């Protein structure tokens, strides 16, 4: 079972989710769509255990962890699939 980290458009670039993740699933990437100039991205979704610490840490309810069967992992925001 893998977990998909859905990233929505309310990221403020605070890095709280990145620091909260115990498995280093998230990272910040450059993005012009927010004031901070960076946005959370999830390049290592195969390592996500669904603990939801990133969701809890997020001050804007930006992240959502959803459980999928198989290798159905995605990154939203059009950054990659």
UniProtKB/Swiss-Prot annotation:
<feature type="binding site">
    <location>
        <position position="58"/>
    </location>
    <ligand>
        <name>[4Fe-4S] cluster 1</name>
    </ligand>
</feature>
<feature type="binding site">
    <location>
        <position position="14"/>
    </location>
    <ligand>
        <name>[4Fe-4S] cluster 1</name>
    </ligand>
</feature>
<dbReference type="Pfam" id="PF12838">
    <property type="entry name" value="Fer4_7"/>
</dbReference>
<feature type="binding site">
    <location>
        <position position="51"/>
    </location>
    <ligand>
        <name>[4Fe-4S] cluster 2</name>
    </ligand>
</feature>
<feature type="binding site">
    <location>
        <position position="48"/>
    </location>
    <ligand>
        <name>[4Fe-4S] cluster 2</name>
    </ligand>
</feature>
<dbReference type="GO" id="GO:0031676">
    <property type="term" value="C:plasma membrane-derived thylakoid membrane"/>
</dbReference>
<dbReference type="GO" id="GO:0046872">
    <property type="term" value="F:metal ion binding"/>
</dbReference>
<dbReference type="GO" id="GO:0009773">
    <property type="term" value="P:photosynthetic electron transport in photosystem I"/>
</dbReference>
<dbReference type="InterPro" id="IPR017491">
    <property type="entry name" value="PSI_PsaC"/>
</dbReference>
<keyword id="KW-0560">Oxidoreductase</keyword>
<dbReference type="InterPro" id="IPR050157">
    <property type="entry name" value="PSI_iron-sulfur_center"/>
</dbReference>
<feature type="domain" description="4Fe-4S ferredoxin-type 2">
    <location>
        <begin position="37"/>
        <end position="68"/>
    </location>
</feature>
<feature type="binding site">
    <location>
        <position position="11"/>
    </location>
    <ligand>
        <name>[4Fe-4S] cluster 1</name>
    </ligand>
</feature>
<feature type="binding site">
    <location>
        <position position="17"/>
    </location>
    <ligand>
        <name>[4Fe-4S] cluster 1</name>
    </ligand>
</feature>
<feature type="domain" description="4Fe-4S ferredoxin-type 1">
    <location>
        <begin position="2"/>
        <end position="31"/>
    </location>
</feature>
<dbReference type="InterPro" id="IPR017900">
    <property type="entry name" value="4Fe4S_Fe_S_CS"/>
</dbReference>
<dbReference type="GO" id="GO:0009522">
    <property type="term" value="C:photosystem I"/>
</dbReference>
<dbReference type="InterPro" id="IPR017896">
    <property type="entry name" value="4Fe4S_Fe-S-bd"/>
</dbReference>
<keyword id="KW-0411">Iron-sulfur</keyword>
<dbReference type="GO" id="GO:0060090">
    <property type="term" value="F:molecular adaptor activity"/>
</dbReference>
<keyword id="KW-0479">Metal-binding</keyword>
<comment type="function">
    <text>Mutant proteins with a 3Fe-4S center are not observed bound to PSI in vitro, and are probably not able to do so in vivo.</text>
</comment>
<keyword id="KW-0004">4Fe-4S</keyword>
<keyword id="KW-0603">Photosystem I</keyword>
<keyword id="KW-0408">Iron</keyword>
<dbReference type="GO" id="GO:0051539">
    <property type="term" value="F:4 iron, 4 sulfur cluster binding"/>
</dbReference>
<dbReference type="GO" id="GO:0009055">
    <property type="term" value="F:electron transfer activity"/>
</dbReference>
<keyword id="KW-0793">Thylakoid</keyword>
<feature type="binding site">
    <location>
        <position position="54"/>
    </location>
    <ligand>
        <name>[4Fe-4S] cluster 2</name>
    </ligand>
</feature>
<keyword id="KW-0602">Photosynthesis</keyword>
<feature type="binding site">
    <location>
        <position position="21"/>
    </location>
    <ligand>
        <name>[4Fe-4S] cluster 2</name>
    </ligand>
</feature>
<protein>
    <recommendedName>
        <fullName>Photosystem I iron-sulfur center</fullName>
        <ecNumber>1.97.1.12</ecNumber>
    </recommendedName>
</protein>
<keyword id="KW-0472">Membrane</keyword>
<keyword id="KW-0677">Repeat</keyword>
<keyword id="KW-0249">Electron transport</keyword>
<comment type="subunit">
    <text>The cyanobacterial PSI reaction center is composed of one copy each of PsaA,B,C,D,E,F,I,J,K,L,M and X, and forms trimeric complexes.</text>
</comment>
<dbReference type="GO" id="GO:0016491">
    <property type="term" value="F:oxidoreductase activity"/>
</dbReference>
<keyword id="KW-0813">Transport</keyword>
<comment type="function">
    <text>Apoprotein for the two 4Fe-4S centers FA and FB of photosystem I (PSI); essential for photochemical activity. FB is the terminal electron acceptor of PSI, donating electrons to ferredoxin. The C-terminus interacts with PsaA/B/D and helps assemble the protein into the PSI complex. Required for binding of PsaD and PsaE to PSI. PSI is a plastocyanin/cytochrome c6-ferredoxin oxidoreductase, converting photonic excitation into a charge separation, which transfers an electron from the donor P700 chlorophyll pair to the spectroscopically characterized acceptors A0, A1, FX, FA and FB in turn.</text>
</comment>
């Amino acid at each position: 079972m893998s977990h998909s980290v859905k990233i929505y458009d309310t990221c403020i670039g605070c890095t709280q989710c990145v620091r909260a993740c115990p498995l280093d699933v998230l990272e910040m990437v450059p993005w012009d769509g927010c004031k901070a100039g960076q946005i959370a991205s999830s390049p290592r979704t195969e390592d996500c255990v669904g603990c939801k610490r990133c969701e809890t840490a997020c001050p804007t309810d930006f992240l959502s962890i959803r459980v999928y069967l198989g290798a159905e992992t995605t990154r939203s925001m059009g950054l990659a699939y």
